[in-house]
């Protein structure tokens, strides 16, 4: 065997394309093939232009070899590939126009002409028999053709599939003719209404006999994995691997889906707004008409001197409409179906889910605050009961201190000394009293305003110093003694008795009040928001600098 044949056998056969490199053979390079050997070989020496799987077909090999021998030896072709003859059927002008107009979009689809013009429903022998009987029984329906019958059946099928997709679960709930007849108006086939009213009982009977499923079986379009399925007539010529969905494709699809949803929502909103505005306009027109009628009624009443109530001239208050629950419509019992479960099987009853009212956040927070206040009040009441027989002397006692009645008669005596008096008068006591009382001596102590022996913290205000006071000097006591509390009472036999006790220490300022106020006189708290931002290029700043320059020039001169 020559080297050409060896290379041809080693070459893997592929599909011939535009960019395929084809070798050129001269007549002297082509070997003389034996017919029997060429029929027995499985792979041709020259590219045949067909797929590799089909090259082994017997009849195809015969046709290829016959054509090759006709080229090489000049003999006539005896075997040809059978093809149908082309002839004019006379209906091309019906579907294809001579004056072709370029469409606005380049969207193409794979539907045939019949699929575009004719309905998907196809009549079977039962439909043909019924349609012939119907035409014979009612001659007025003889004008309708089989195509019209298919359109009616297709319309019924589409409407029931759209409105009742789960009809197979309960066939007794099939829609009546009054609800299906409206679809003929939308599809612009009103001329088929007489035929539809006669065909509806037949279609309803066939649909129920099918168990609620479509009357016409659909073509099963699935994967070609089940090659042994006898019901699949046409299989794909070659199996291609399904393209894997990439992430970018999924994102693009998701964006387009959301865009379409938003556009549909916008369209629905616009339609609802248009309907609302129409209703508002109609309401305004009705109100205006009512107003004109009322004006006419008022004029007639005045003319005829009719004294009646003005109920017709005032709009009555609208009461809220109470929606009454509609009475359940009795439905016929569905046909009894044989259950696949045994006789002992009992379905579980459905659970009644209790619907609870929706709680608001404000209500929950107010309830929590109320519960907290109740718990706090209970704790305070409990603590008050525990501290009932005790006295709390802290600054912020939890319980109120009740002063005993005898202790309320004590009076404070606050002595002070003056530098202008003699040394003997230093030992004498004098009290500024806000209320008149009987003195014990001429310069002796007097009774001041009532104070409790347990609450002497307010005496700090009466002991405040002032730099303007003439008594302020070196002889003044900066740290006065604790005031003496005295109480006058009458004992047995009319004796006058004076009880004396020391009060609690008085908390005083370490420095006079005036000095404390002077310390904070010029103190200004700093705040970042109070910062004043100066603009050097403002008119005020420029005028200020100009005035400084004039002053400097004046001083130099």
Swiss-Prot record:
Annotated GO MF terms: protein-macromolecule adaptor activity
Residue span of region Disordered: 323-349, 424-449
Compartment(s): Nucleus
One GO term describing the cellular component: piccolo histone acetyltransferase complex
Gene Ontology terms describing biological process: DNA repair; DNA repair-dependent chromatin remodeling; regulation of transcription by RNA polymerase II
The protein's name in its UniProt record: Enhancer of polycomb-like protein 1
Domain of life: Eukaryota
Low complexity composition-biased segments: 429-441
Function, in words: Component of the NuA4 histone acetyltransferase complex which is involved in transcriptional activation of selected genes principally by acetylation of nucleosomal histone H4 and H2A. The NuA4 complex is also involved in DNA repair. Involved in gene silencing by neighboring heterochromatin, blockage of the silencing spreading along the chromosome, and required for cell cycle progression through G2/M.
InterPro entries: Enhancer_polycomb, Enhancer_polycomb-like_N
Summary of subunit composition and partner proteins: Component of the NuA4 histone acetyltransferase complex.
Main location: nucleus
Keywords, ordered alphabetically: Cell cycle, DNA damage, DNA repair, Nucleus, Transcription, Transcription regulation
Biased composition (Pro residues): 327-337
Pfam family, one: EPL1
Family: Belongs to the enhancer of polycomb family.
């Amino acid at each position: 065997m020559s080297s050409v044949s060896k290379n041809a056998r080693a070459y893997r056969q592929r599909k011939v394309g535009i960019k395929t490199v084809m070798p050129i053979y001269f007549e002297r390079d082509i070997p003389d093939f034996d017919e029997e050997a060429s029929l027995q070989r499985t792979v041709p020496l020259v590219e045949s232009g067909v797929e590799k799987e089909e090259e082994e077909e017997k009849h195809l090999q015969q046709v290829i070899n016959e054509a090759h021998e006709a080229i090489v030896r000049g003999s006539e072709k005896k075997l040809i590939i059978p093809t149908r003859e082309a002839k004019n059927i006379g209906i091309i002008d019906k579907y294809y126009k001579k004056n072709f107009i370029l469409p606005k979009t380049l969207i193409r689809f794979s539907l045939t002409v019949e699929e575009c013009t004719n309905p998907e429903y196809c009549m079977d022998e039962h439909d043909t028999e019924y349609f012939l009987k119907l035409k014979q029984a009612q001659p007025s329906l003889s004008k309708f053709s089989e195509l019209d019958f298919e359109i009616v059946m297709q319309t019924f099928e589409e409407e029931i599939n759209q409105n009742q997709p789960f009809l197979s679960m309960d066939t007794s709930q099939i829609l009546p003719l009054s609800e299906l007849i409206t679809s003929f108006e939308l599809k612009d086939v009103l001329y088929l209404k007489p035929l539809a009213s006669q065909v509806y009982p037949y279609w309803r009977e066939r649909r129920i006999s099918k168990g609620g499923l479509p009357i016409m079986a659909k073509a099963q379009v699935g994967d070609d994995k089940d090659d042994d399925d006898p019901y699949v007539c046409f299989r794909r010529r070659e199996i291609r691997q399904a393209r894997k969905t990439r992430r970018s494709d999924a994102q693009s699809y998701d964006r387009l889906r959301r865009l379409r949803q938003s556009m549909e929502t916008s369209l629905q909103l616009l339609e609802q707004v248009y309907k609302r505005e129409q209703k508002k306009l109609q309401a305004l027109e009705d109100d205006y008409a009512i107003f004109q009628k009322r004006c006419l009624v008022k004029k007639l009443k005045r003319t005829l001197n009719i004294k009646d109530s003005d109920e017709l001239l005032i709009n009555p208050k609208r009461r809220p409409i109470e929606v009454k629950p509609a009475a359940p419509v009795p439905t016929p019992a569905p046909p009894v179906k044989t259950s696949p479960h045994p006789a002992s099987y009992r379905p579980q009853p459905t659970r009644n889910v209790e619907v609870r009212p929706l709680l608001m956040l404000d209500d929950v927070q107010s309830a929590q605050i109320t519960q907290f206040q109740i718990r706090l009040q209970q704790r305070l009441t409990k603590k008050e009961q525990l501290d009932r027989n005790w006295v709390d002397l802290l600054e912020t006692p939890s319980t109120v201190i009740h002063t005993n009645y005898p202790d309320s008669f004590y009076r404070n005596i606050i002595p002070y000394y003056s530098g202008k008096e003699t040394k003997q008068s230093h030992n004498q006591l004098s009290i500024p009293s806000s209320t008149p009382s009987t003195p014990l001596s001429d310069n002796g102590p007097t009774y001041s305003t009532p104070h409790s022996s347990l609450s002497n913290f307010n005496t700090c205000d009466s002991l405040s110093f002032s730099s303007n006071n003439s008594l302020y000097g070196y002889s003044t006591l900066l740290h006065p003694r604790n005031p003496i509390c005295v109480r006058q009472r009458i004992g047995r036999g009319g004796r006058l008795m004076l009880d004396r006790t020391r009060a609690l220490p008085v908390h005083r300022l370490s420095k006079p009040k005036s000095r404390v106020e002077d310390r904070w006189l010029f103190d200004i708290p700093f705040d970042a928001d109070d910062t004043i931002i100066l603009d050097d290029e403002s008119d005020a700043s420029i005028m200020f600098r100009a005035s400084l320059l004039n002053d400097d020039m004046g001083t130099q001169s």
